[in-house]
């Protein structure tokens, strides 16, 4: 080994290998001779190994057994401390038997015997066993003297056997060969190995040295010899991927690995090569009167980590293994604190500060999907999911999960084994720097620039830049983190990484899709009062939005003053700054105001972005955050066509590329209503704009939107505008043929997406008689059954919800038909009859019951917690029929050729027209079932799972307040952004 310890340690290291295996020679002439021998051996190369068949393995076992019997001599008095050869050799024997049992038949055994690594390993094991036997023969009585050179050589062989056991277990975990899949801890070191050696498990030292020299120059043959003795832990003239991983972890970082090795192993007097725990203690005993004396060695029980032994102020000798930091940093910190002052008792303590040059941290950028996902859960990607207080600043290697340093330290100090998330062995850590999500980086924002029909795929973020950056600056204070494969996917993801996977459905994410975190009972106690955390079910905290939602009851619905909308053939001009819902009954649209104030209250914990649920909706789409008055926000999204459509388009692409993409692809919002935020109040803006939802891909029934616009007395016909983002004929008479790809809407009566809540509700309010019918005259949006109620639509009580032409006079086709496949009628149909949900939605008496309609999201209710159910993501017509019961959680690819529908229009105000009253009476028989559905939808909108809501309502006998209390007591709602001010 390349040791700078005293010459005694240098001579000690030469006995086992016959040359200088670890120490430098004080004699330059001898060093040159040894270097010449090494060069000759490199030129010749190691001999080829014979096949390691069963006979060879059994012969090796006999040699190992003989070594064990020799070491069991009572006169030897071996100490039962690592490395204990009487444990190591039997363990090696057992693991070899396990390997042979996995390759029992002849074909597999032949494959094993020809395995390059296994042949080299068995040959080396046989040679080391013979060498140990020779020690006893040559040493004779000196073997029983604890301080003799022969005894020291036996101890060194014990260390080598220990390294070999660790290596065979790493390459053959559970007896199966995994050398080609071995994961090197440091990413840059792994890249080096893959580049030069591919999937090889072991390479000759000569080849390894040449390849390493191309990246890190090796100055001389003597340095190469010393380097080999450091890396070649098993002393077999080969470098395995396992040994390379250990070396890179010990002398990290990779960019300066040889420089670090020279400072720490070659020139540092405190480095001890191949020393054991007992030997370190014995060596420091002579410095017991000199506190601060220290030496360090490779840990034999935790390969890849350092063990530092030092003398305390009271003369005791302690040994410690530093965690989560390079050795030079641990030595610098210990020197500053007065623990590591005199290496090997010497007065000169090398200055290692030069090794502390700032190394570039692993910058992790938050993807749009991660950003939206964590916003929907009321958290931020960079927030540590264990404590929910600090930012993630460290990455665990090799699994890639992310967390804050304080949590990792606490976990390790409490004897936590492995990664807190996946329990994978922690082989190292890397500091990370979180970069905030910036939509400009990937053209995620778009602006319509007053164009009437800007194609949905054109990305132009100029208009949104300023607003998006507001959120991004806030988020940057908390430093958002990318995937570690980035991820990071926190981890996911976490991390990580890291290996980003398609984000799961937001409808399920809060409960299922994030890695579990270590339980934090203390945090669970104060979960509701603490900042939000994006961890999954195991998360110690629940989102404060769930607490504060209950504080702001929504006002009763405004009086029904709505008029029938004009014909749907309206032109679609839409000013970019128009607001759809901003000026709809400003005085009555209290939910908007509540939304704004609630955002402020909800995010009071930290504007730095640790928990930005308020901005989580907005930041993504660029709407103002945290009390900043939103000029126009639909469901917490900026209603500017530029902002919302920009993200819609991006999500549109995402849905096309990955069918399982989450529903939150709507302007960065989850398709489920529980994550949508009702529009905020803001000064009356220009005429309203209608954003098109990518998942809907249809020009949303503009007359429905105009219907809402008509809701305001001061609005004129100019407010009937088709979304400027319409990629298809914006002047079409708002036919539902564009909705033909929404069988979910038709088949389940569900809201297509959060972006279409209003429009869909409008669609629903217009009884859809036939596929593709135009919603022309319906003025009162009849709520569509929520995503959660879709599963119940097949139930008997939902007969009114059965998708029949009679039930959906205007829009919904018969279940047997392809939804909206028929060509749209050229003329607007008569006012549609109210759907089953109408009694709750339109009748003032039912205002307390939240209808299943998604449009109800925008309806102010007297009930303090009207939350709409989670709308499912859109799916293809064929899929919708086959998966009706599971649609609420499905994330489905958008139809690329389908026109895009606007995002949520403003809240429709129920009107009491004769047709509605008539239909209300007609479906009054089912109002009870719909009331139950509305209650389920309301509680689901607060973030509780469907099954728990259903069970709680059964226990509470359909009493919403009692059910809510039960859910809060026994089911932690996932942290979500407040959408309705519940």
From Swiss-Prot:
Positions of transmembrane segments: none
Zinc finger (RING-type) stretch: 384-423
Top-rank taxon: Eukaryota
InterPro entries according to UniProt: Adaptor_Cbl, Adaptor_Cbl_EF_hand-like, Adaptor_Cbl_N_dom_sf, Adaptor_Cbl_N_hlx, Adaptor_Cbl_SH2-like, Cbl_PTB, EF-hand-dom_pair, SH2_dom_sf
Ranges of Pro residues composition bias in the record: 554-576, 825-834
EC number from the UniProt entry: 2.3.2.27
PROSITE patterns: CBL_PTB (PS51506), UBA (PS50030), ZF_RING_1 (PS00518), ZF_RING_2 (PS50089)
Catalysed reaction equations from the record: S-ubiquitinyl-[E2 ubiquitin-conjugating enzyme]-L-cysteine + [acceptor protein]-L-lysine = [E2 ubiquitin-conjugating enzyme]-L-cysteine + N(6)-ubiquitinyl-[acceptor protein]-L-lysine
Positions with biased composition (Low complexity): 1-14
Locations listed in the record: Cytoplasm
Region (EF-hand-like): 179-251
PANTHER family per the UniProt record, alphabetical: CBL (PTHR23007), E3 UBIQUITIN-PROTEIN LIGASE CBL-B (PTHR23007:SF3)
Protein name: E3 ubiquitin-protein ligase CBL-B
């Amino acid at each position: 080994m390349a040791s700078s310890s005293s010459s005694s340690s240098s001579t000690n290291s030469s006995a086992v290998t016959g040359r200088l295996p670890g120490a430098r020679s004080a004699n330059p002439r001898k060093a040159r001779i040894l270097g010449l021998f090494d060069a000759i051996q490199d030129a010749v190369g190691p001999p080829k190994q014979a096949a390691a068949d069963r006979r060879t393995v059994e012969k090796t076992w006999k040699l190992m057994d003989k070594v064990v019997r020799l070491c069991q001599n009572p006169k030897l008095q071996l100490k039962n401390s690592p490395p204990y050869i009487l444990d190591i050799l039997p363990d090696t024997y057992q693991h070899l038997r396990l390997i042979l049992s996995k390759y029992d038949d002849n074909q597999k055994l032949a494959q094993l015997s020809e395995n390059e690594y296994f042949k080299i390993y068995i040959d080396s094991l046989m040679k080391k066993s013979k060498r140990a036997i020779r020690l006893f023969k040559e040493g004779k009585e000196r073997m029983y003297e604890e301080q003799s050179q022969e005894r020291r050589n036996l101890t060194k062989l014990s260390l080598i056997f220990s390294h070999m056991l660790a290596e065979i277990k790493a390459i053959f975990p559970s007896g199966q060969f995994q050398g080609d899949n071995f994961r090197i801890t440091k990413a840059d070191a792994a890249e080096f190995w893959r580049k030069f050696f591919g999937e090889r498990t072991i390479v000759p030292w000569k080849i390894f040295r040449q390849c390493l020299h191309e990246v890190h120059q090796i100055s001389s043959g003597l340095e190469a010899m010393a380097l080999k003795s450091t890396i070649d832990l098993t002393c077999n003239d080969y470098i395995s991927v396992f040994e390379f991983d250990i070396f890179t972890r010990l002398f990290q970082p990779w960019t300066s690995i040889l420089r670090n090795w020279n400072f720490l192993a070659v020139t540092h007097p405190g480095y001890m090569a191949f020393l054991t725990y007992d030997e370190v203690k014995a060596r420091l005993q002579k410095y017991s009167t000199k506190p601060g004396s220290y030496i360090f060695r490779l840990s034999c029980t935790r390969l890849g980590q350092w063990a530092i032994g030092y003398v305390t102020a009271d003369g005791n000798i302690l040994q410690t293994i530093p965690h989560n930091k390079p050795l030079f940093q641990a030595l610098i910190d210990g020197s500053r604190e007065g623990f590591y002052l005199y290496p090997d008792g010497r007065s000169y303590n090398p200055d290692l500060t030069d090794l502390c040059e700032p190394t570039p941290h692993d910058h992790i950028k938050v993807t749009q999907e991660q950003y939206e996902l964590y916003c929907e859960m009321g958290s931020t990607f960079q927030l540590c999911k264990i404590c929910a207080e600090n930012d993630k600043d460290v990455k665990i290697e090799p699994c890639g999960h992310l967390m804050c340093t304080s949590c990792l330290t606490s976990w390790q100090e409490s004897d936590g084994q492995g990664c807190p998330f996946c329990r994978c062995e922690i082989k190292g850590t890397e500091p990370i720097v979180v970069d905030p999500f910036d939509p400009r980086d990937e053209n995620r924002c778009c602006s319509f620039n007053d164009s009437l029909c800007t194609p949905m795929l054109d990305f132009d973020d100029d208009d949104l830049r300023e607003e998006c950056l507001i959120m991004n600056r806030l988020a940057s204070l908390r430093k958002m983190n990318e995937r570690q494969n980035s991820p990071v996917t926190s981890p996911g993801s976490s991390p990580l990484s890291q290996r980003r996977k398609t984000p799961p459905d937001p409808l399920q994410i809060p409960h299922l899709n994030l890695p579990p975190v270590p339980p934090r009972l203390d945090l669970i106690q104060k979960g509701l009062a603490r900042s939000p955390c994006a961890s999954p079910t195991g998360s110690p905290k629940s989102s404060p939005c769930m607490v504060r939602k209950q504080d702001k009851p929504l006002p009763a619905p405004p009086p029904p003053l709505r008029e029938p909308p004009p014909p749907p053939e309206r032109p679609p001009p839409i000013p970019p700054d128009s607001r759809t819902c901003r000026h709809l009954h400003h005085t009555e649209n209290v939910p908007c105001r509540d939304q704004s104030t609630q955002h402020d209250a909800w995010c009071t914990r930290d504007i730095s972005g640790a928990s930005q649920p308020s901005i989580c909706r907005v930041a993504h789409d660029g709407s103002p955050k945290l009390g900043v008055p939103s000029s126009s926000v639909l469901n917490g999204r900026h209603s500017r066509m530029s902002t919302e459509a920009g993200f819609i388009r991006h999500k549109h692409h995402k849905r096309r590329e990955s069918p399982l993409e989450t529903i939150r692809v709507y302007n960065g919002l989850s398709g489920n209503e529980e994550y949508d935020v009702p529009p905020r109040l803001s000064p009356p803006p220009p005429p309203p704009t209608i954003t098109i939802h990518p998942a809907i891909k249809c020009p949303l029934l503009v007359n429905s939107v105009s219907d809402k616009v008509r809701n305001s007395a001061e609005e004129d016909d100019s407010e009937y505008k088709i979304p400027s983002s319409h990629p298809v004929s914006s002047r079409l008479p708002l036919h539902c043929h564009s909705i033909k790809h929404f069988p979910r809407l038709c088949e389940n009566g569900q809201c297509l997406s959060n972006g279409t809540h209003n429009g869909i509700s409008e669609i629903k309010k217009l009884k859809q008689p036939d596929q593709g019918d135009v919603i022309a005259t319906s003025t009162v949006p009849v709520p569509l059954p929520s995503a959660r109620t879709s599963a119940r639509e097949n139930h008997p009580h939902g007969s009114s919800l059965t998708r029949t032409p009679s039930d959906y006079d205007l829009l919904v086709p018969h279940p047997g038909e392809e939804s909206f496949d028929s060509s749209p009628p050229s003329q607007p149909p008569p006012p549609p009859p109210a759907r089953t949900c109408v009694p709750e939605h339109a009748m003032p008496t039912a205002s307390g019951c939240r209808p299943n309609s998604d449009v109800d999201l925008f309806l102010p209710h007297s009930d303090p917690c009207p939350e709409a159910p989670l709308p499912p993501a859109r799916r293809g017509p064929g899929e919708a029929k086959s998966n009706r019961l599971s649609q609420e959680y499905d994330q489905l690819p958008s139809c690329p050729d389908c026109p895009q529908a606007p995002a949520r229009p403003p809240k429709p105000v129920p009107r009491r027209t004769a047709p509605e009253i008539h239909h209300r009476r007609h479906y009054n028989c089912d109002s009870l079932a719909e009331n139950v559905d509305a209650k389920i939808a309301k509680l689901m909108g607060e973030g509780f799972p469907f099954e728990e809501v259903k069970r709680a309502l059964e226990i509470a006998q359909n009493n919403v307040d009692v059910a809510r209390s039960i859910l809060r007591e026994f089911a932690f709602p996932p942290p979500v952004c407040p959408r309705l001010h519940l």
